[in-house]
Amino acid sequence: MEIFDLTIHELHEKLKAKEVSSVEATRAMLDRIEAVDSQVNAYITVTPEQALVQAQDADRRIAAGEIAPLTGVPVGLKDIFVTKGIRTTCGSRILENFVPPYDGTAVAKLKEQGAVIVGKLNQDEFAMGSSNESSYFGPCRNPWDLSCTPGGSSGGSAAAIAARTATATLGTDTGGSIRQPASHCGCVGLKPTYGRVSRYGVIAYASSLDQVGPLTRDVTDSALLLGAVAGYDPMDSTSVNTPVPDYVAGLGKGVKGMKIGLPKQYFIEGLDPDVKRAMDEAIALYKSLGADIREVSLPNTEYAVATYYIIATAEASANLARYDGVRFGHRAENARGLAQMYSKSRAEGFGPEVKRRIMLGTYALSSGYYDAYYVKAQKVRTLIQQDFLNAFKEVDVLLTPIAPTPAFKIAEKLEDPLQMYLSDIFTIPVNLAGTCGISVPAGFSAAGLPIGLQLVGKPFGEQEILTAAYSFERETQWHLKKAPL
């Protein structure tokens, strides 16, 4: 097995035993990126010089006996995290040459543990998309089939795990942007509860929905990485001051007696037959492990996509108003006057999907439509949250598909934005409810594309979904399969 194939916990044991150094692991990963990333396009920026300096520092820590779970481990970051001295583009032309003066909290926490940052990963522009096709830096490709998308918006973060060009990655999830690409690329992707991980230093898309989370090769790695970045942060007023448990310690509890709910609105006609088969097999496996499977109802699910695309775009239109060419980012040349400089900078800097969402959001917030759209959407969001809270009075965890289909072809849905939006129908409600969800590899389609299983937990119920995911992973081999790169 190559160094770049190892999980966080496997590499940690080798580093601890001094069987391999962090410099060797980092060089192996940088060589792997050079060998295969031209096919995948998972990275926007690779940082070999900084990575090797961090690796040398990690080796000094290890020699001194100071080794944390992520010390010396090569990780990639979605290009939405601000990184001191490293270009941060958010997949957009408007930030093509932006170099931040500080690290976001999640990045700082990784550095505190001695993780090695090998680069910044491709994504949909400003995290707006489900296929990684809206990136100014070109689409990222799915390592399982280079003609398919890896999903989005954290497409590069998932593709790098599948291509084995990072040991672990961080992404963000606003409406499914960690879980859907994890499903399409055959890796584990966890969206924590809103407020569990600080958003300080994450470029904002929709501030009441965005959440930081890990993408990894297995569930143990997911627990390790979540434990490293979770926790209260005074720099983020929405972060919640609750203790961070040792997620790894609770993985082996098993699911005997666990009540698992199947929301009837998620098992609908139109579900791809391969996805349905994978879900049926997963349900049967949980039954055999002693879980108590029961049907539940989330009656307002049908309104989730419409609600999301009003709230998220409204917040985006406000958040993206700051990009005007004055203090940072792209500035249009040859503008006559300030007003034209604003409009030209934005017209040149933003791509079509971002413009579409800004227009949708501005419309929803405009005085004549504010009550009819935005206020109504917030009321429906409250109903959706209540649906989940009611369901969790009966069950511990929900089991659902992640997406109606496996990964789709590049350009297949570009002409029909609504089809693209609907591909997030099973992930969006979890963000609206503000709770946690995980994608775990659960099989393959007839065409050999990965299929993910979603487990949804109560607010701050990450331990339960990690335990349920680990029990599933232990009984299956899906997470061990490798993309043919």
Curated annotation (Swiss-Prot):
KW Protease (keyword) present: no
Database matches in InterPro entries: Amidase, Amidase_CS, Amidase_dom, AS_sf, GatA
GO function terms (MF aspect): ATP binding; glutaminyl-tRNA synthase (glutamine-hydrolyzing) activity
Residues the record marks as active site: 78 (charge relay system), 153 (charge relay system), 177 (acyl-ester intermediate)
Transmembrane region(s): none
Enzyme Commission number(s) from the entry: 6.3.5.7
Role summary: Allows the formation of correctly charged Gln-tRNA(Gln) through the transamidation of misacylated Glu-tRNA(Gln) in organisms which lack glutaminyl-tRNA synthetase. The reaction takes place in the presence of glutamine and ATP through an activated gamma-phospho-Glu-tRNA(Gln).
Organism encoding this protein: Geobacter sp. (strain M21)
UniProt keyword list: ATP-binding, Ligase, Nucleotide-binding, Protein biosynthesis
One cellular-component annotation, GO: glutamyl-tRNA(Gln) amidotransferase complex
Name of the protein: Glutamyl-tRNA(Gln) amidotransferase subunit A
Similarity remark: Belongs to the amidase family. GatA subfamily.
Annotated SUPFAM superfamilies: Amidase signature (AS) enzymes (SSF75304)
UniProt record, GO biological process: translation
Subunit field text: Heterotrimer of A, B and C subunits.
Catalytic activity: L-glutamyl-tRNA(Gln) + L-glutamine + ATP + H2O = L-glutaminyl-tRNA(Gln) + L-glutamate + ADP + phosphate + H(+)
PANTHER family: GLUTAMYL-TRNA(GLN) AMIDOTRANSFERASE SUBUNIT A, TRANSAMIDASE
